[in-house]
Amino acid sequence: TAMIAFEASESEKTLQGVERLLVEMNALGMKRGSTLAAVGGGVIQDVATLASSIYMRGIPWVYAPTTMMAMLDSCIGGKSSINVTGIKNLVGNIYPPSRAIVDVTLAQSLPVEARVAGYSEAVKICFAGGPAALDRFMELVIPAEMYGNELSSRATVELTHHVLNVKKWFIEI
């Protein structure tokens, strides 16, 4: 087991960034049966998805998201994209992780803005999922927000399960 440190910035979400990761994977001796584990937010996910999908014609990968947006949305489905010649998200593919490990306790350490960004994506997913999905989202989020509190750990777990189940339904249809 080895670790590759990778900067989570738009400047690394490029073909050159993917190439750097591929070279590191090769230097570590990763083989066709190896598994890439990615821990981070959306940029890390995008680069890891593309790299694992093309390394030796595709190796399994596992994802542990660290942002609310990734926990509530992008950790399933496997959609990725990178920037090319300054054009955002020009190249991409779909290569789902073999497993997503979501630890919602990480959400408690995020700034409010980062949590709200995740909730914004979640409400969009639930709205598209229909009235029952949106009502459940509101039941989980509104009580805490009305009183200026953060979601409890239990509510965050329930919200995450709910939103990912709604998204899973979309992916499977």
Give each language-model segment a name.
Residues 14, 18, 112-119, 130, ...:
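Generic structural signal for well-ordered, non-membrane alpha-helical segments
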Residues 22, 138, 164-168:
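Amphipathic, well-packed alpha-helical segments that form the structural scaffold of globular domains
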Residues 30, 34-51:
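Glycine/serine-rich anion-binding loops at beta->alpha junctions
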Residues 49-146:
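A glycine/threonine-rich phosphate-anchoring loop and its flanking beta-alpha core
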Residues 144-173:
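Active-site segments that bind and position negatively charged phosphate/pyrophosphate groups
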